[in-house]
Amino acid sequence: MNSSKLFFGWTDESSQNKGRYRAIGMVSHPAEFGSELEGDINSILDSVVDESGLKRRELKWNKIDIFRCRAYEKIVDYFLELSNLGNPPVRVDILRWDIEDSRHSIQGRDDNQNLQRMYYHLFSNVISKRWPSGDWCFFPDETGSVDWEEVAFFLDIGGSKVDLKEQFNILSINEVDSKDNVLVQVADFFAGLSVFSKEKFGLYVDWNYEECGQQRLVPVENVEFSKKDRKRFEILSYFNKRCKELKMGVSLDTSEGLWTPKPANSINFWHYEPQSDADKAPIR
């Protein structure tokens, strides 16, 4: 009888094929914690409905509104409190990259192959280093940029194919509808928050000065913030404040974007840095 421990991983992507920064978010946990975790997130969303009278809707970072703002704050509290436990039953890992760095700023870059390579890095980090050995079931958002049915279990990482079954013990890859899967929605939230924190860091600093009623030492021109960005700044500020209060080891200012210096932490924001001059994205 196979007694290997089973784990689940839920992923979504942010800003694929647009913008300077791209990311993949992954929520992972032992399979036996899945029902409790999903139940807790659904209860959080229902509580927002009960408290506000607002209609429940799918969480999407690119469609921010009052309901989603309130839900995100409660989700932040929930995951930070879980992560503060001695042996957290869940991880959130976000891999972000910059298409204008030395690795990606090349002619003929193949974004689809590059995304597959980034999934490989994420799998390698989370599956191989962050959890005990075991088997995995993987649930990506069906609207993601990788056609998992076509890829099957073989990621193309540029001239070679990686067998996910053999290397990472991934038993199944089932694309799911994010509308029906709250953990994919959570992965979307953290991936979107990561990209936003890097892309809009300068504006976030300006907004923060305005919120605190402070004057900059060096004055800047008046900046207009969109209503949606103001809501996202509020979420980013809340997340940053709660991380500091709970000593979560997540930094915002140091790298001008969310970053976790110790990747073993159960909420891990990771910005991919080129490993050498020879580290280049695949080309078409």
From Swiss-Prot:
It comes from the Archaea. Keywords: Plasmid. InterPro entries: DUF3800. Pfam families: DUF3800. This is Uncharacterized protein ORF2'. It comes from Methanothermobacter thermautotrophicus (Methanobacterium thermoformicicum).
